[in-house]
Amino acid sequence: MSEKTEVIDKKDIVIRFSGDSGDGMQLTGQQFSDAAALFGNGVSTFPDYPAEIRAPQGTVGGVSGFQVHIGNDPIKTPGDFADVLVAMNPAALKANLRWAKKGATIIVNLDAFTDKNIEKAGYKENPLEDVVLQDYNVVPVKITTLTEEALKDSGLDQKSIVKCKNMFALGMIYWMFDRTVDHTRDFINQKFAKKPEIASANVKVLESGFNYASNVHALAVHFNVAPAQIEKGRYRTITGNKATAWGFLAAAEKANLPLFCGSYPITPATDILQELALRRDLGVKTYQAEDEIAGICTSIGASYVGNLAITTTSGPGLALKSEAAGLAVMAELPLVIVDVQRGGPSTGLPTKTEQSDLLQALYGRNGESPMPVVAASTPGNCFDYAFWAAKIAIEHMTPVVLLTDGFLGNGAQPWKIPSLKDYPSITPRVAKEGDDYKPYARDPETLARMWALPGTKGLEHRIGGLEKVNVTGEISYVPENHQIMTDLRDAKVAKIADLSLIHISEPTR
């Protein structure tokens, strides 16, 4: 390390990788966050990508980013502003400069700052020559040229060579934070095991970026972020959507029930459906419905026949599910509706996060239709809240809304893998043949009715959205009975509010 290189000890620091969609910024950011987690840092991440499948290259609308917040304590958020920004082209700089702190180190790919790219990004002149950057430590590096130089004898075509340039930037960042390239080298060799020439090229460029940063002393600062003091255990990096899916798997195991997910794909909730679709080995059934209404209705049907049933969506989909959610309230069937919130209203901001669906979750149904609402606060505790949402739904025979959001769902953090024995049992109250069954006879403690599965002799009863007579379950239009049932449904949910979930909450730092 050069004597001119300043070593700065930091409690925490935010790094933002940005470039065109297709520049590999998501992979680059994920690799750095994984390496930081393996080092022992607290980590929180957030991918930032456009709603369009592929906006025109070099435009601000096509910029993809990945933000990583690391620290020597557990980290709860991906951070507000970046201390280090990697911008692979002018559009990435324009889109992300406002998220860089004054004095931030900005590494730019100088090769991308052509007149054409500068114009496409919306600049009137080269921003690298503008006073707008005078408050930042700008490090211009010919990343594309240096990548081509490293691979000139590789035998790869030009397109394949240029694709490796994100690894050069990652190598520089690894040096900047005193991290080894070992984790990413192993990842590349495993990922491209059947394409050794691609693996070799990416590893060579990764090491070239690291060596360039260490030898030419282009970077004037070197950051030191010590490992965090965390509870001992086995950890992995997990996104909120994956943690949500796993929480439901754990709940199904504890309840000894099959798990069913009926959903329509919607950003940013789709990963939950995709994760559960991989777990047929655990008896999970998934159904990709033709629309939001079909998704929730299949889940209500699955609940009726004895499954732990869930449906996943975001704000616009929650609006479409509202009538069927009211059916689940009226039928008093267990169901979990997961709302991974995004910016609204209407289509809104599909890939941006927002927490604006609370009132819709509480009141967005016709009539008086009370429903418990629980909300996660970190990617990791999405597991806990999914588990508890399922437990509440099953033991209290009610639909439940679980609120997360785009940051929680797509963001990631180190997560201590729990033991199922540390979680409480989940006890479905299922009526059996020979019971003196009354459809709306209630448990005196919870006011929950019994779960009667179709096909069980002697448990035939009416089901559906029409009001029922208390206890007997006959259809009724009598106002006095409707008031009784309305009060009972309200009282049942009010009892749930007394549950203490404090033991699954995490301390705030």
List each model region and its residues.
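Thiamine diphosphate
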Residues: 12-100, 164, 246, 251, 259, 341-368, 483-505, 509, ...
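Flexible, low-complexity linker and terminal segments
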Residues: 238-247, 255, 385, 390-505, ...
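Structural beta-sheet core signal
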Residues: 108, 311, 337-338, 402, ...
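Active-site cofactor/cluster-binding pocket
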Residues: 2-255
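Gly-rich Lys/Arg/Thr-decorated short loops/hinges at beta-loop-alpha junctions or inter-strand turns
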Residues: 51-52, 149-151, 218-233, 251-258, ...
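A glycine-rich phosphate-binding loop feature that marks nucleotide/adenosyl-phosphate handling sites
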Residues: 49-50, 205, 226-230, 264-268, ...
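Conserved thiamine diphosphate
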Residues: 133-136, 140-146, 352-405, 425-433
